[in-house]
Amino acid sequence: MVFNRYALITNCNHKTLGLYYLWFSFLFGIYGFLLSVILRTELYSSSLRIIAQENVNLYNMIFTVHGIIMIFFNIMPGLFGGFGNYYLPILCGSSELAYPRINSISLLLQPIAFILVILSTAAEFGGGTGWTWYPPLSTSLMSLSPVAVDVIVIGLLVSGIASIMSSLNFLTTVMHLRAKGLTLGILSVSTWSLIITSIMLLLTLPVLTGGVLMLLSDLHFNTLFFDPTFAGDPILYQHLLWFFGHPEVYILILPAFGIISHVISTNYSRSLFGNQSMILAMGCIAVLGSVVWVHHMYTTGLEVDTRAFFTSTTILISIPTGTKVFNWLCTYMSTNFGITHSSSLLSLLFICTFTFGGTTGVILGNGAIDVALHDTYYVIAHFHFVLSIGAIIALFTSVSFFQESFFGKTLRENTIIVLWSILFFVGVVLTFLPMHFLGFNVMPRRIPDYPDALNGWNMICSIGSTMTLFGLLIFK
């Protein structure tokens, strides 16, 4: 009985820890989503609505915390931590992960990191820097509360330590605890997605850690790494951040690829079309995704040759990504086109939204076009189509598909589940599709006010956000 009471801090079973990851992801995600509802409530009409003129920095603080929570505390614990912990040992034929106690510690670090990030909102001005924490704003003692930046950075360092421990755990399990005769070549796409994600985390997280530690030392110890007055370079920080920041996008979406591949293959009783090419495509995405970080920085005064190189490599990523979409559709086309399960419907919705988000990414990857669209709502629409719709739908797909394993019972495949799927999908599309048009009208992101001419599109976005909220309320 005592152990049941303290199961969170005493249990080392990989399935139990995976479920805890999913619950944490769900709870943290609700908090982050409600912050986005506040943003859309503010933006439903021009002029300031619910945020007072003298407290407009609250808007900056809300979108900063929203971004950090949804990336580091919703999608990563859900897809990488939850799905990975629960199913990686099973897919490898192992009874347990290599280091169960380290696995337990990495889980316990997640709520600690979350609380630290939330504490930043209690500071006088909050840490309204955006989730990218660009200097000189984040290193200025004049405009923000230094303690808010401190707790955000420390929270992210704690979260990074947890992610690195999980990655080492997964890789060690795959390399040394596989079932006899199960070679790397015959591992499933889902397993390979977690292997590649773990490798990317191990290669890129140390760079982010170095960058934010330099940021902290600039803030408190006068090191002047990023102060151009004393021969520092704020662009150096952008390189360090985005060297992690762009692979992070693929770290978030690769486990989703594994889940969707598994769901489509199992629901339709078909082996995945081009199974080995799917694994190769994920490897290509990981390699190319690690050398395109400068496409976030086209407006920082790059040389033409540099922009040409990063434009080419960015657009090149569409080839392996297109391979994956093609193979998913070919697997689906070899069936009788039926929707056998709610997870089948969700996986098809994922393919549609991910394809659309990837198409807008090809447009943004062009160095000439991005100069016009940089920091507009077009960028927000692009990455929310891939992450907010794509990765989150993949998370719901996994919960729907593995519900019997996770919860010990199966929900009835009744009308309300289909209605929820459609309501949620229509809500998020209605939220983010009009943002492309706002971007073409050059509405800048991170600004709480805008011209009256843009009222129509913004009102549609806010209606979509409300629909999504109602959709989540009926999610079982």
UniProtKB/Swiss-Prot annotation:
Protein topology in the membrane: Multi-pass membrane protein
SUPFAM superfamilies: Cytochrome c oxidase subunit I-like
GO BP annotation list: electron transport coupled proton transport; mitochondrial electron transport, cytochrome c to oxygen
Catalysed conversion reaction: 4 Fe(II)-[cytochrome c] + O2 + 8 H(+)(in) = 4 Fe(III)-[cytochrome c] + 2 H2O + 4 H(+)(out)
Annotated Fe(II)-heme a binding sites: 66, 384
Cell compartment(s), UniProt: Mitochondrion inner membrane
Keyword Iron assigned: yes
Protein name: Cytochrome c oxidase subunit 1
Organism of provenance: Plasmodium chabaudi
The encoding gene: COI
